[in-house]
Swiss-Prot record:
Residue positions, PTM Phosphoserine: S194, S294, S302, S305, S323, S333, S337, S339, S343
DNA-binding region(s) in UniProt: 1-195
A Pfam family assignment: MH1
Protein name: Nuclear factor 1 C-type
Tissue specificity field: Highest levels in skeletal muscle. Lower levels in heart, liver, kidney, lung and brain. Very low levels in testis and spleen.
Organism: Mus musculus
GO biological process: DNA replication; negative regulation of transcription by RNA polymerase II; odontogenesis of dentin-containing tooth; positive regulation of transcription by RNA polymerase II
Positions where Phosphotyrosine occurs in the chain: Y300
Amino acid sequence: MYSSPLCLTQDEFHPFIEALLPHVRAFAYTWFNLQARKRKYFKKHEKRMSKDEERAVKDELLGEKAEVKQKWASRLLAKLRKDIRPECREDFVLAVTGKKAPGCVLSNPDQKGKMRRIDCLRQADKVWRLDLVMVILFKGIPLESTDGERLVKAAACAHPVLCVQPHHIGVAVKELDLYLAYFVRERDAEQSSSPRTGVGSDQEDSKPITLDTTDFQESFVTSGVFSVTELIQVSRTPVVTGTGPNFSLGELQGHLAYDLNPASAGMRRTLPSTSSSGSKRHKSGSMEEDVDTSPGGDYYTSPNSPTSSSRNWTEDIEGGISSPVKKTEMDKSPFNSPSPQDSPRLSSFTQHHRPVIAVHSGIARSPHPTSALHFPATPILPQTASTYFPHTAIRYPPHLNPQDPLKDLVSLACDPATQQPGPPALRPTRPLQTVPLWD
């Protein structure tokens, strides 16, 4: 469990996030925030941070509370989950956790069909490519936002344009990097009092290469504030260190539903057979407008809609963001199961008055039509008019069981005696009696 249970909202308790959170490097929080602080300082003062100021910011970020880092990582994972195609989310979790061989994980493209860019901080002025974010988040490699050209996809990657699998992404090492690595290695060898023999030509293999420290210092200036040892150490530290969520992949596979009710005791995540509380969608901070559609592209469910609810993770993977029930499934529902005596009347009723309602595939349907519909005492979502339900009154088929709690509503809607008086009907009037004028 988290050391501070109230620090996370219901959005950070998704199994996708809980499974990946222990694999996020704590260095990612420090790195993204450090780059943002440097850009903000430059815009405000029109000059770069001094080494002392940058080092102070680095120490401040490294000493941040674990709850803050975990909350930031959870929000970023929720944003990444939204940008990963639903059919690839499960494979992504299994690959990162080591339960499955890594395969291509496709992301949703931008309007030009290329890799999307997202912001990694709130109110950030910088956007990062998704593959860059994945490398920094799960490998702890200090890359700049302009280092997208240095990323190289593996030969086994079948979709190099949109794949964000961290195991398929590498960093191209240039000659300059190798040259600098030589001096770093020699410096570490001198500090450990164990000089090494450098790599030279065939005639100079037996001769040690001496390190000209003066020439190195005159040619290169270190711009960062991380030392080599410190950089390697912090880049390997996970964001969850001993206080992570009480979650395992076996628990995820054994329980497919989850409860996002923040009012539970101690914020402990329960796993009932159904879920009732609504979940709020994150707004992705990308350069392009986010157009959220289901894989079919035909339906979209409003977050303010009464049918919005937390759904099964596996169903979310198979059905996408909003997966409406097929017509055959609606026909099998208790509301569309006519009794023998009502079949003729119902067939004519449902043919012309069948309610058109988009229903989530994750909403549990009871096998008994007499089951009561339980709603929370307080509304989960604000009572606003939804554009997806233009009619305020919905007619239901008149074959509901008398014990159904909707009986009063149905009888009120279907009883002609209780209908609102409409315009007066035109009745045939008595024929006028014609009286001859000549009588």
